[in-house]
């Protein structure tokens, strides 16, 4: 029995947006090898996603979007992640921002409505730019070096952001910066892409997720309006993370890497069914040892499906969840995904690591799950400290 997230309901009961994602998946998957090889950005994927209304998946229905919750969004990300995880990662960051807009009391309504309208009408993506060369990820603490200076006519922004996923296509940046006020505040400012003084340095040359366009964005005295504050507070007020941001980020990232493992599993099954070594005279799939390893892969993917489904459904139903719980699920799902692909490589020998076969690419992509925030060591330390009361 094969358990998948994408097709767990009879087709007649599938929401329309799931059907649209499934329809696009084959097209997106066909483009993935070339974009991976060239580290080129898949602009055409986002044009297709926009045409199908899927960029507005988490935009509230009242604002013209689909209004999907975490469960359906995780399913879409799993489908697209299986086809091309680079595209799915950019998409996930965009989805998270619109979920936060819809649920946060801190996002200015005028700004969230403007961005919702643009997303419904065209290709208008947003991502949070947070990571810096010296700071690393702010998830581990510390103040950003990027600074917003207040003037009579607008904010003036200077700083450098690295690993800015989707940089080639983003229309909006939610930039993590500190102010130059007498009492420093820190938080997010909404900055339009392409303003004078902004430049993208194409620094992303990674082992995996090569088509995600996670380049460096440099702000050199960039001017933007004073009313573009999203959420700027005293540093101590950020000790408790935004609930929506922290929980859905972890589960959406997990869904993407689970999708990668499912792509690897599908290729493996076909390979084992078709590969007939001369000394065996039968497909590799006939060997008990092979069946056992594939069964182990199925077990890991079945666990992943249940974890993602149950957690996302609980979030949608309003259950009280914690960031630590979501981080543990991300840790478990991504490590299951990595192990599933490693087991697939074990069965395929040189074939699996050949660049003519997709398993090599899936392996490079799935390894990124181990370094993607929240990282495993941080999750374990947080869970351990909570259990020990320290």
Where are these regions (language model features)?
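Glycine-rich phosphate/pyrophosphate-binding beta-alpha loops
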Residues: 162-167, 248-252, 369-372
